[in-house]
Amino acid sequence: MNSATPPADSAAFCADLVRSHDFPRYVATLFVPAVERRALLALYAFNVEIVRVRDQVSQPLPGEIRLQWWTDMLSGHAHGSVEGNPVAAELLRAIRDFELPVEPLSLLADEHQFDLYNDPMPTMTALEGYLAATCSALFTLAARIMAPPSEAVEHLARHAGLAQGIAQVITNLPRDAAHRQLFLPQQILDSHDCGIEDVFAGKESSNLRAVLDQLVSEAQQHLATAISLLAEVPPSVRPALLPLSQARADLKRLSRPGRNPFAPQPASRLRTLWTLWRASRSREFTK
């Protein structure tokens, strides 16, 4: 991997990318010192680039090629100039400066190959494995930028990622169903006699509500565990965990009776700012 220092405009590019596509994490970086903030924005911009691949291709093969470029870049075998890609250049700088492990970054990219296909998510265990390799890994890597790694931080990050990831699965249901793709576990759909074609058709039902209620409950349990572990990690890690407060707000919204699961409900940026600012001043992110 090339260790040349990328230009400052690469950092600005990453900041703009994260602000546009992952606003809660962008806001969380506002509570971080400049050096760590630059590394966090590089990490989050990498995640944005990986997640966006699904929406940038119409067939799986071009998506696989794009994801493979990132894994090749991380292993030092990228084709073409890495320095010409501002996100890659910034990510390599963050890896160098904070000794970030490459393997979880590569696994994150690999796991998102699932997004390129319309295969059903078979079980809750499979969903948790997917989220652990993506959302939880992102929390773990962000925490590593803020403080030395520890088992306590990894334990918290796993539950944080599962809580946030399940909330995102429910939030993204309208978009995913419109593309005939579901991250709702087939196992849970079957247990509530909820047909996948009904979900694709945008059909509201008590069966689907039962599925979503079960997932919200799972996410709330992970959220409660993550928050209970906050006291066991260094205070310097807390800014990397601030997106948990947005997950908590999302789960509260998603559990409201009578909510239409197929009606997109984008969060207000002002409300997101308020949520994370209040969380930054609260010991348990809950005020």
Predicted regions and their residues:
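Flexible interhelical turns and helix-capping residues at alpha-helix boundaries
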Residues: 120, 146-150
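Catalytic cores of Mg2+-dependent Asp-rich isoprenoid enzymes
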Residues: 1-92, 101-112, 131-140, 150-166, ...
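Alpha-helical transmembrane segments of multipass membrane proteins
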Residues: 141-145
